[in-house]
């Protein structure tokens, strides 16, 4: 199967391209073929003469009477091609007289010849189209008919619009024709020109004396632009024209006619006169700050300057001039060709008007003056702003006596004020002082009361100790005087009792038994129980207190002479031993020898003090000191952490006690420990 040759590559079109209408992008088309002389003569398009595919030739001269529509083609157009929209022929322009417009003969531009690959078609021939290439065979064996070919037709050519109007003057440039004699090539007449005089009325008369005011230079609207350039305003320095404003066409320098008017109305108006500032307050000080008008001479000079610069400008009357005044005559400048023979009338003095700040209406002058006078009088007689010294003003007082009286009164008020401040300050100082003294007195009373209470407590305690001492001495003497036949026991307690009473009770109880002990039985029971429970090997023995409930239970049981110690805690038994020594009514070392004991520094002094104590007390020491020395041995101390110093520190309060409370108890405790340590070291 032979391959079809590729379609010829078309070159870029060389003709014109229509602008897009209604947002439809038109494709460029090839230039139409050049029309023949016969077609030009008959003013017909090639579409009517030739084929249905050749585009319409543009015609330079449009005949309104000849308008024909091309027949519709039988070939199906592509969806992308532009629709064949019928275009209306523009209306025939007419001139001012109602006749056909005046046209100018223009040279027809010759279109370039069509490309070589475009073949001319006859009405009976069909267009040559490239063959359709089928990319895939049909599904069935039957051969399907090929789809109709798609022909891309060029869009219809645009309707030739008439050329822009060209102004052709019918006469020479020396004499300007009227607006009615001007002819436009496009058929559009120029608007009539209305000239106005200095008084504002229309000037329709032609004055031969001043050709510049009544004649219009020839207008030339060239075919390139069709619109004259904008005028420019300048001042002519010619004395004959009186500095009148002129409008000159900028194209006049190129030789074309220009439009000038020396008596035209000025385009620029002078700025409005300054409006004086208004104050919203009735204060005369602020009301006096209005912008006052200048002097008459300055105003006349300014207005003369304005008149000399712009004679053709009619200024309106100033807003502050009373027009109803008979002296006011508006000044109107004369014509340009006439000299000024009269001087302007005198300027009426301008006075600022008082206007309402709400609706900007003029206030009644007389009423305003009355209000201003009333306000000034009120301000001068008692409503002046406050001064350094309130309530009074020296300006109000007219005589010197009143001023002196006022000054004296002020001085008196100042003295009274200072006196009140001084009294108030003294009163405050006295109150502060009294309050401070009262507070110090209360603190001193509290201190005295506290000291008194402490002294009472000391005296009461000392008295109680003396009573106890006297009572114990009397009881001991009475017990010694008892007959042997009397078997009554005064105190059977073992704790909180004297050593002599405990030994007497113990002898009475041991009379029934064959053996007797020289020291209390409780010492033997407690020390043996501690050794049986491995007390010396228990860490912190005699230093760690046992259970308080167990100690109280066993204490009550021993006081009832029940010596069955049913406990397995060596700390409870060690606590009972220390408690018995502390609760003795008289300590083992008598209180009379306390000061000598803490002052002893050698073993001889300690031996001398021991020789002075009673025999029963010596028996207790002879039993207790060897036991303490045994417990503090080094082979026990490595387990119990209780060496001789620690043991002496624990038992010194039970062996030595002072009956007088002093502040040197902590210092004396060290001396007590040294005394007990010396006793333990002296033990065999």
Swiss-Prot record:
- Residue ranges crossing the lipid bilayer per the database entry: none
Which portions of the chain have biased composition (kind: Low complexity)?
54-84, 94-110, 118-131, 168-188, 197-226, 233-264, 293-311, 472-486
Q: Report the main location listed first in the record.
A: cytoplasm
Any one GO BP annotation for this protein: signal transduction
Task: List the record's Gene Ontology CC terms alphabetically.
Answer: cytoplasm
Q: Which residues form the signal peptide?
A: none
Checking SMART domains in the record gives: RhoGAP
Please note every region of biased composition (Polar residues): 11-23
Localization per Swiss-Prot or TrEMBL: Cytoplasm
- Comp. bias (Pro residues): 1-10, 144-167
Q: Record keywords: Cytoplasm included?
A: yes
Region: Disordered; residue ranges are: 1-283, 292-311, 403-489
- What keywords appear on the UniProt entry? Coiled coil, Cytoplasm, GTPase activation
Q: Where is this site: Arginine finger?
A: 543
Any coiled-coil ranges, and where? 399-473
Q: Which GO terms describe its molecular function?
A: GTPase activator activity
Transcription keyword on record: no
Residue stretches of biased makeup (Basic and acidic residues): 404-470
- Domain Rho-GAP residue range list: 497-684
Q: What does this protein do?
A: Rho GTPase-activating protein involved in the signal transduction pathway.
| The protein, known as | Rho GTPase-activating protein gacO
Species classification: Eukaryota, Amoebozoa, Evosea, Eumycetozoa, Dictyostelia
